[in-house]
Structures are given as structure tokens and as C-alpha cells.
Amino acid sequence: MQKTKILRKLMGAVLCAGMLVGLAGSMSVTAQAALKTVNISAVYGKTKIINDLKTVPIVSSETKISFSKTSKGIKFKSQQEGLVKFKADGKNYRVLVIPDNLPKNNFKFGLLKCKNGVYYTEQKDKLDSWVTVYNSNDYDVDVTYTHSDYKDKSTLFESRKYTEKALAPGESYTFFVYSCMPDSKNSVSVTKSKYQSVLENDVYTAVGTFNQLQTSFDCINNTNDKITVKISYAKLDKNGKINSCGETEDVVLPANSRQNYTILNYGFCPSNVKIVDFHAYITK
């Protein structure tokens, strides 16, 4: 069974809004708009060398970020998470400082975004899209992933929403959707959850059988509550990388039950489907 390792360490809420630290002095609106923006990421509490940065930015002594000059570039280090902004060498720098225990294999750091304490990254493969989210808050959150297909760059064809309830602290999850059009956009919204997440050890799920037409899942609920299990599954290549054809499904399990569920693949899924991720919450 393939699934993301869940790290249960509680963390403080991420300051997604970030803070602006920059050079003293004023600049015109026109001049600001002309500056090139550089987007990079760094890990909380660890040194990041910014190679193309030659000048040490001037920052307030009250900030939790530091810079030092080396022969290879400027060393950056932050003791705060979230988005850090500063200006230097005629450029706008935006550094997304991510938690040290983010499951790094599931995220492309250069594409990372953050909203209300949830980090997420999106990928596409032809008409397949998937968004992996990670909750760095110290409370359960509901994450809504909206996928919009466009007939062209500006004409909306349809939008579909998928809500993942009670994503636990330190938990990551992968949404999948099959696009109807070549042009599509993804967005994520986050709210504090009214649901209660279920610990990983209380739930078991695995791929039972699979073929071109359908996939069956074996699921066990060891809790005294009725729960909903969210399953993300996809084709993986020989290196374990997501290749194509992903789906996300809801499975409701009665208390203390063992169930087998069969889900149609609509004929386009290959026959080496594996579970990429799953998590569960108490059903209201």
C-alpha cells in the first residue's frame, strides 16, 4: 500500500500572509511594477544559499530572518514559517519558508503555495491534475480543492469542487481530477474543521483487485464510530512516481467493520493502480 507518512508533531499556525521586509526608502508604483520577482523556497531553521543574490538585504532587527555573505551567494535563514518578502539587487524576492517535517517527496518546492496554514502544490500530466496538500496547523482543517476547466484561456467550461474534511495536523493528502479541457486552473481554500479526524492506526485500507474496468478496496474500521475514508489512487511508474490516471473516492465504513468496495475505472485506468494516500474522519 502506498500512502504518505503522517507526521503527528503539532506545529504553530503558519503565517501565510508573511511579512514585508525591505530596503529603506520609498519607490514609485511604476518602479515597483518593473522589478523582477524571484520565487524560491527554504526550510524553517536551515540555511539556504541564494546564488543570484549579491547584496545583503537590510532588515529590521526584530525580524526572525538573517543573511550572511559567502563566495557562492547570500545565506538566508528564517526562524518563522510562511511567506517572507524582501527587495535586493533590483528584484523582489518571495521566499516560502516551509516546515522542516513537510513530506518532501510529495511536493515540488518551487511550485509550493500556502493558504491558512496549508501548503499545497499542483501537477499536471496531459489531462490529469492532482493537488497535494499538507496541514501545518495544530488543529483539523477542511480543504476545498476547486478545479476549473476552460474552453480557451478566458472562457470557463465548468468548475468542480472537492472538499477534504478533517485533515489532521501534520497530515498530507492528494486530490485527483480528470480534466475535460486542455486548459485548467486549480485553487485551494481552507477552514477550521467541525469534524474529527481518525488516527491512522485505527483504519486500514488497501487495493484488493484491479483491472482496466474497476478497482476494489479492502477497508477495515477499528473504531466505535461510523467513519468516512477518503482514498486517492493512481497509476505509478516503476520508480513510484505518479504517472497518470488518478481518482479520489469516498468510502463510508460502519463502526468496527470490514468492507470491500468496488469502484469503476471508466475503462481508461491502467491495471497497476495503487493507493497514493488516504485518511479518515468521523461521519456526522
Segments (PLM) and residue ranges:
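Sec-dependent signal peptide cleavage junction
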Residues: 21-36
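Solvent-exposed, low-complexity, repeat-rich "mucin-like" stalks and linkers
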Residues: 34-60, 171
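Terminal connector regions
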Residues: 171-215, 266-284
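A short beta-strand micro-motif common to beta-rich folds, especially ectodomain repeats
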Residues: 80-90, 229-231
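Intrinsically disordered, low-complexity Pro/Gly/Ser/Thr-rich segments with frequent PxxP/GP/PP motifs
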Residues: 40-42, 155-183, 242-269
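Asparagine-centered strand-capping/turn motif at beta-strand->loop junctions
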Residues: 132-139, 219-223
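Low-complexity, acidic Ser/Thr/Pro/Gly-rich terminal tails and inter-domain linkers that flank the onset
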Residues: 101-126, 190-213
